[in-house]
């Protein structure tokens, strides 16, 4: 149990969205809640989770547990991302562009939460299409999963780093 307590301390959590939904039954409406959360260690690991329950705290707890189970390693070094990337999920599109040190995170609330939890400090973003926070967060995670360090890109293509940067 102590191991689990230590593990939970190193991750920071952010609730992106809480929604009340209703199921119409013969006696009226039965309300429940769902929550979308982002969890990250601010050193390159980030995850998103979705939880549903009859009470808000239970939905939040479930979403955070789900996010911790679905952590993804993001390939970046330093303060920004190595290259421009576009993430897609359903009709949501998110573009992430590297920026110079000191720029900060230029992003909407949904994109900002996942980029901050990943540990990226300087990035320019633009989202279009669906404005649903669930779709935007998943599109952002898709974009972050596409990131490659120059070493990985060169290895994948079977060329040297010098050739990758056009110095050969």
Curated annotation (Swiss-Prot):
GO terms for cellular component: cytosolic small ribosomal subunit. GO terms for molecular function: rRNA binding; structural constituent of ribosome. Residues 11-74 form the S5 DRBM domain. Keywords: Ribonucleoprotein, Ribosomal protein, RNA-binding, rRNA-binding. Pfam families: Ribosomal_S5, Ribosomal_S5_C. It comes from the Bacteria. The keyword Plastid does not apply. The keyword rRNA-binding applies. One of its GO terms (biological process) is translation. SUPFAM superfamilies: dsRNA-binding domain-like, Ribosomal protein S5 domain 2-like. With S4 and S12 plays an important role in translational accuracy. Located at the back of the 30S subunit body where it stabilizes the conformation of the head with respect to the body. The N-terminal domain interacts with the head of the 30S subunit; the C-terminal domain interacts with the body and contacts protein S4. The interaction surface between S4 and S5 is involved in control of translational fidelity. Part of the 30S ribosomal subunit. Contacts proteins S4 and S8. Belongs to the universal ribosomal protein uS5 family. This is Small ribosomal subunit protein uS5.
């Amino acid at each position: 149990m102590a191991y689990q307590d230590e593990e939970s301390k190193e991750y920071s959590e952010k609730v992106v969205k809480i929604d009340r939904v209703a199921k119409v039954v013969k006696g009226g409406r039965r309300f429940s809640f769902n929550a979308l959360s982002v969890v990250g260690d601010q050193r390159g690991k980030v995850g998103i989770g979705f939880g549903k329950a009859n009470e808000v705290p239970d939905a939040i707890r479930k979403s955070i547990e789900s996010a911790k189970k679905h952590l993804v390693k993001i390939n970046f070094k330093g303060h920004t991302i190595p290259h421009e990337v576009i993430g897609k999920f359903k009709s949501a599109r998110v573009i992430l562009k590297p920026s110079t040190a000191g720029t900060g995170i230029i992003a909407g609330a949904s994109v900002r939460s996942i980029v901050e939890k990943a540990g990226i400090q300087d990035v320019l973003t633009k989202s279009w299409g669906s404005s649903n926070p669930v779709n935007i967060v998943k599109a952002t995670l898709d974009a972050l999963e596409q990131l490659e360090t120059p070493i990985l890109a060169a290895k994948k293509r079977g060329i040297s780093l010098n050739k990758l940067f056009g110095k050969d």
